[in-house]
């Protein structure tokens, strides 16, 4: 194998395995967090591999260093407005700046130290449009307003119109030319989540990502039923390419995460790098804590509540208060738990990469089956403060 070939395989490891939060010391899931353990210092793994970081007594991950995506970010700052952090309080009102590459105001979102998925917010002016785009990464888009439409077109094929409104979700077919149009008299915002970091880390070529003529006709071939498909395959599984209203879509029971909770996983656009699911909790209910080895964007669609996130074994937990429009992410392989102390249901959309992680042979998630008393006690206080009742599991 040539030196170039060796480097490509190293990049694949960094992009697909290490940066996805690869579990280097995985053991059986715990039923409760273990006592606080002293954190070991980060250790150098290799020139291309990054640093070893302990994320708990039983877990380690590789923190990538100077990846192709990191290098792209450093150069993009000159012409791209960039947000870096863990929480955007409200994507509907967060400050935006002119983004020449998109043709409208926007904000690129780099969450945590993620290296698989990224995001961005755009605002299309009344009766305006974005610049046409085409790329070799998957993309899911949630629209905060409307009406509007998106034109998608394969080379040499007829254009197709995708109509959307507030709360619509659409997966752009891979490497198809597309452009968004605002048909209304008010500005429209959208949130997009993509697999751009993973593709760039894997190929180390911006030209490959943005100037590739290959057509994925097995995914999209301008077929007449593409936009109408809505096949419910079984509990919590639906194949579709457009969700007209993510807040009204009927969900299935999902008691694995807790009694009275519901959920639906959408397989959209033939995507294999990003996955979509929506979950709902009634008032007075919270979901079981879990952690996973991939990036995950969480967008609140309705309700008010909070989430907790923490490293395995940590006594101190970080609290994120949320409401409609909040976007937040848990750090790789940190536990996180969503709680609804209000009286009305809370629904959220999560976009992550379980299929990608699983196909690499990695364990995707762990779950804590029994909560520590302090979480239950805090939740009971929050529910009481709002005049509600905790719905206990039998």
Question: At which residue positions do the language-model features occur?
Answer:
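Bacterial N-terminal signal peptides that target proteins for export
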Residues: 2-13
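Short acidic-glycine-tyrosine-enriched beta hairpin
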Residues: 154-173, 312-331
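Bacterial N-terminal signal peptides
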Residues: 11-22
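Glycine- and acidic-residue-biased ligand/ion/polar-headgroup-sensing regions
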Residues: 125-126, 135-155, 283, 292-312
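A short hydrophobic beta-strand segment most commonly corresponding to one strand
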Residues: 140-142, 171, 185-204, 298-299, ...
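Histidine-centered metal-chelating micro-motifs
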Residues: 129-131, 149-150, 168-180, 286-287, ...
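Conserved short histidine dyad/triad with adjacent acidic residue
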Residues: 101-107, 118-135, 277-292, 311
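A short, N-terminal "cap"/entry segment at the start of jelly-roll beta-barrel domains
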Residues: 28, 33-115, 205-273, 277, ...
């Amino acid at each position: 194998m040539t030196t170039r070939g060796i480097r490509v395989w190293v990049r694949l490891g960094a992009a697909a395995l290490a940066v996805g939060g690869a579990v280097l010391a995985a053991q059986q899931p715990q039923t409760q967090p273990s006592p606080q353990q002293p954190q070991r210092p980060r250790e150098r793994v290799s020139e291309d591999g990054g640093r070893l970081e302990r994320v708990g007594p039983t877990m380690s991950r590789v923190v990538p260093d100077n990846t192709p995506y990191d290098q792209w970010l450093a150069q993009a700052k000159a012409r791209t407005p960039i947000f870096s952090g863990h929480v955007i309080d409200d994507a509907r009102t967060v400050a935006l700046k002119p983004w020449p590459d998109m043709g409208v105001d926007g904000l690129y979102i780099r969450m945590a130290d993620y290296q698989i998925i990224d995001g961005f917010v755009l605002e299309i002016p009344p009766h305006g449009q974005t610049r046409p785009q085409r790329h070799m990464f998957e993309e899911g888009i949630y629209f905060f307003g409307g009406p509007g439409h998106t034109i998608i077109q394969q080379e040499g094929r007829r254009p197709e119109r995708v109509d959307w409104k507030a709360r619509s979700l659409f997966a752009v077919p891979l490497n198809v030319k597309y452009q968004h149009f605002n048909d209304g008299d008010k500005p429209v915002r959208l949130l997009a989540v993509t697999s751009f970091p993973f593709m760039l880390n894997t190929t180390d070529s911006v030209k490959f990502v943005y100037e590739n003529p290959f057509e994925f006709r097995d995914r999209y071939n301008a077929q007449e039923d593409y936009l109408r498909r809505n096949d419910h395959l079984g509990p919590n599984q639906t194949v579709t390419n457009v969700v007209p209203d993510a807040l009204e879509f009927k969900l299935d029971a999902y008691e694995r995460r807790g009694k009275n909770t519901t959920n639906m996983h959408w397989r959209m656009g033939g995507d294999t790098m990003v996955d979509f699911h929506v979950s709902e909790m009634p008032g007075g209910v919270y979901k079981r804590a879990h952690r996973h080895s991939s990036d995950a964007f969480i967008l609140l669609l309705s309700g008010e509540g909070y989430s907790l996130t923490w490293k395995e074994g940590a006594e101190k937990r970080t609290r994120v208060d949320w409401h409609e429009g909040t976007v937040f992410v848990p750090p790789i392989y940190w536990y996180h738990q969503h709680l609804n102390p209000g009286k009305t249901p809370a629904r959220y959309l999560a976009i992550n990469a379980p299929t990608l992680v699983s196909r690499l042979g990695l364990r995707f998630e762990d779950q804590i089956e029994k909560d520590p008393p302090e979480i239950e006690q805090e939740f009971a206080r929050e529910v009481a403060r709002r005049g509600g009742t905790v719905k206990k599991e039998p």
